């Protein structure tokens, strides 16, 4: 390919020092050299990703100016890498360039970051990223003919602009994913622009690219949120569960070594350090492929692919078969007399090994459920090990595991039952109401997006054999989007509590959330009047958006409304919309208690 070459990982600013250890084995040296091989065309892409993700508001012209600064800097360091400025890490150099561009920090409100140095500055830039990109204009779309003409006129500029638009709308997506997306998009443009049916071709090619980007974004944001809010121990627990389920024959010692590379990868990638992210991900993939015989029989084809394609292939590869003779229980954690002593001697290693053994034996469970069981086990041992007869106590811990799993399973069964009975549209309205009750502070666009994601999760999973793990995993990712990546995101006390108290049990926490009643309630008549005016306002707008806004406003103003009440009102407004006639007897939708609440609210309003 002309611009994005998938034959090796892209690396730039070679003279800059990085924190990863230098390899010593010949095969590792070869891989390291391949990773460090500089491909000049791709310097621009990595720079665009970094600048666009750190300052999403920056214009394309501003990003292009910064890229030129980067290229000049690279050339100076190539010519003389002993210059003091060339000893910086790539990420520090990138942030220096952002801060040094005249007027840019003030214009885009990140000057407070430029007053910091080192880790505090890197963290500040990270916290400055915005997951909700509603402040950006809609993604620019071109007619397929115009798109192809622009691509033929100047393919490099066309692809640079595409990379800029995608990167700033996906500020937490790792650089290797964005590079792969851009490469696939270039392949699509090259192919489709030669076709008669260009629009059909682009649609077919775009679907898997969009799906890959969306899935990667959701998972990476969730894991980075866990790292930022709960620290490296929770991140390690997630990775132990994920890798043990996928590669059940890997030994615990080998897994521990692999996860050292994985943890390093997430630290750099989550922070937005594009160079560290690419290099460390390359190291993880190389580690897996160099030991594939002892890790998995399912990844041989993946390891033969081009480097950027390997990761996606390994992620999507089937789970390896459970080793023969592996029992469903590991006795050392429930039957041994020395459980408490082993826990006390090295708690981190002990519980990591527990997750490893339990996960490889129960690949049917979701990652969140495996973390819940681990938390139950930790709490149970805390109690048992303080008793006179600990062994007699913790022998019954399996009962607690089963109770926890049954609670989670019941939630999934209820959600899939709703999916089967309600249909997609009604189900989305159900979740829209549910999310709005819990978090009325969120903008409508975000609430609609969350409800769509839940419906998509159930649509994907509720007909599968591994329904439970699939739904629980994807539903947890939706909550990860609600909670956000940054520690400084706050919604309301109840939601914040669920998001920040216990990563493993946040889904259970959300399930029991009541409506946030801190919102003020207008009278029923004022509510109906406002909703009717909005409903009948002539706008060039999709009817579905009006329906969504109707429900969101209804619930924001009346958080105590029941399912029957909002459904009744929704039906009445829908029936009246054709002629925008008066809504017939809207008050009849409300129970006496609801009417009373509305009257009390009206009385309160008069007192102000």
Curated annotation (Swiss-Prot):
N-glycosylated; more than 90% of the glycans are sialylated. Glycans are attached at residues 33, 109, 153, 402, 488. Pfam families: Serum_albumin. The gene is Afm. The keyword Signal applies. Detected in brain, especially on brain capillaries (at protein level). Expressed in isolated brain capillaries. InterPro entries: ALB/AFP/VDB, Serum_albumin-like, Serum_albumin/AFP/Afamin, Serum_albumin_CS, Serum_albumin_N. The second albumin domain forms a deep binding pocket that contains palmitoleic acid (in vitro). Palmitoleic acid is most likely not the physiological ligand. Instead, this pocket may accomodate the covalently bound lipid moiety of Wnt family members. Residues 583-608 are annotated as: Disordered. This is Afamin. Belongs to the ALB/AFP/VDB family. GO terms for biological process: protein stabilization; protein transport within extracellular region; vitamin transport. Residues 215-319 are annotated as: Binding pocket for hydrophobic ligands. The keyword Protein transport applies. Disulfide bonds join 77-86, 99-114, 113-124, 148-193, 192-201, 224-270, 269-277, 289-303, 302-313, 340-385, 384-393, 416-462, 461-470, 483-499, 498-509, 580-589. One of its GO terms (molecular function) is vitamin E binding. Forms a 1:1 complex with Wnt family members; interacts with WNT1, WNT2B, WNT3, WNT5A, WNT7A, WNT7B, WNT8, WNT9A, WNT9B, WNT10A and WNT10B. Interacts with WNT3A.
